Swiss-Prot record:
Belongs to the 'phage' integrase family. XerS subfamily. HAMAP family: Recomb_XerS. Transmembrane segments: none annotated. This is Tyrosine recombinase XerS. FtsK is required for recombination. One of its GO terms (biological process) is chromosome segregation. It comes from Streptococcus suis (strain 05ZYH33). The gene is xerS. It is found in: Cytoplasm. Keywords: Cell cycle, Cell division, Chromosome partition, Cytoplasm, DNA integration, DNA recombination, DNA-binding. InterPro entries: CB (IPR044068), DNA_brk_join_enz (IPR011010), Integrase-like_cat_sf (IPR013762), Integrase_catalytic (IPR002104), Integrase_recombinase_N (IPR010998), Integrase_SAM-like_N (IPR004107), Recomb_XerS (IPR023670), Tyrosine_recombinase_XerCD (IPR050090). Residues 16-121 form the Core-binding (CB) domain. GO terms for molecular function: DNA binding; tyrosine-based site-specific recombinase activity. Its main location: cytoplasm.
Length: 356
């Protein structure tokens, strides 16, 4: 979704929200949470508040008029009823008779609500320096996580990674072969954005940065001589990230056409640009997601930008066998998250079984 459209949809949701949600929004914007995350959270709050109205747990016609004390006095049974509603309600916009949403969707909804309740009961301060209320019903609500061993998860992910020579083969494919079967119209669009798209793919594969970190890169954040970029990690922390050398020619090629191709002025600080209505704009996350999906599906298998992050992490662990190094590269505070990559590249167990 383009940034302008995303902000427009956020404004539409903000117009119907209670005052305390608007305060929450401003607080999380300062963290900073991404606009995409806040948009998804606002949608979850709308769904929850509409359920409160339909269930007669609040006697107001407008969501904006929902009082704060309604949230304070919600019971565990109320929240369990909401979860059951999510499990059993008919799916919308789907050609299926199946009811209910997935457990992943339910967990996402509960995560959004937990964030709001934590803000109201722990983080915000009233005039007396106290939170708005203390009773956090979300702490009594348990979520059901998908049961899967690291080995099983690793095996599933491994099929969607471009390991070994496939990293460069993927970039070469986009560079030289992807355009062969395109229509004239598609070819024109591809050629206009080819250098930019290759630079984005190469950066993701060579640094392992998150999608949001790539989107928010500014010109001043990129040092092509040192092959280091400055990014804003989760929680707003700034971090220096090394970039593998194979990305340099792609990044330099993009820089060579950036100003003229996208009509960039000195005020256009975003590193990766798109053109919208003849004007340069910072490329949005949705455009990168669609671009990665398009090229990867044509090459081998449809993947997400996050799988390119997994690809870098797996290749780096395979080369160094250092979880600490991989953790630092990805911006993780500890090595627990990187346990997955040891399973992806660990063939010792399979080799031992082959000897039986």
């Amino acid at each position: 979704m383009r940034r302008e459209l995303l902000l427009e949809k956020i404004d539409q949701l903000k117009e119907i929200m209670p005052w305390f949600v608007l305060e929450y929004y401003q607080s999380k914007l300062a963290v900073p949470y991404s606009f995409t995350t806040l948009y998804e959270y606002l949608k979850e709050y709308r769904r929850f508040f509409e359920w409160l109205q339909d269930s007669d747990l609040v006697a107001v016609e407008r969501i904006a008029d929902i009082p704060l004390d309604v949230l304070e006095h919600l019971t565990k049974k109320d929240m369990e009823a909401f979860i059951l509603y999510l499990r059993e309600r008919p799916l919308l916009n789907a050609n299926t008779t199946q009811n209910g949403v997935s457990q992943t969707t339910i967990n996402r909804t509960l995560s959004a609500l937990s964030s709001l309740f934590k803000y109201l009961t722990e983080e915000v301060e009233n005039e007396q320096g106290e939170p708005y209320f203390y009773r956090n019903v979300m702490k009594k609500v348990s979520t059901k996580k998908k049961k899967e061993t690291l080995a099983a998860r690793a095996e599933n992910i491994k099929q969607k990674l471009f390991l070994g020579d496939e990293t460069m083969e993927f970039l070469d494919y986009v560079d030289k072969e992807y355009q062969v079967n395109l229509s004239k119209r598609a070819l024109s669009s591809f050629q206009k954005n080819k250098e930019r798209d290759l630079a984005i793919l190469a950066l993701l594969l060579a640094s392992g940065v998150r999608l949001s970190e790539a989107v928010n890169l500014d010109l001043r954040d990129v040092n092509l001589n040192m092959m280091i970029i400055e990014v804003t990690r989760k929680g707003g922390k700034r971090d220096s990230v090394n970039v593998a050398g194979f990305a340099k020619p792609y990044l330099e090629a993009y820089m060579g056409i950036r100003q003229q191709r996208y009509k960039a002025e000195k005020t256009d600080t975003a590193f990766f640009l798109s053109e919208y209505r003849g004007l340069p704009n910072r490329i949005d996350a949705s455009s990168i997601e669609k671009m990665v999906a398009k090229y990867s599906a044509d090459f081998k298998i449809r993947v997400t930008p996050h799988k390119l992050r997994h690809t870098l992490a797996t290749r780096l662990y395979d080369a160094t066998k250092s979880q600490v190094l991989v953790s630092h590269q990805l911006g993780h505070a500890n090595t627990q998250v990187t346990d997955l990559y040891t399973h992806i590249v660990n063939d010792e167990q399979k080799n031992a079984l082959d000897q039986l």
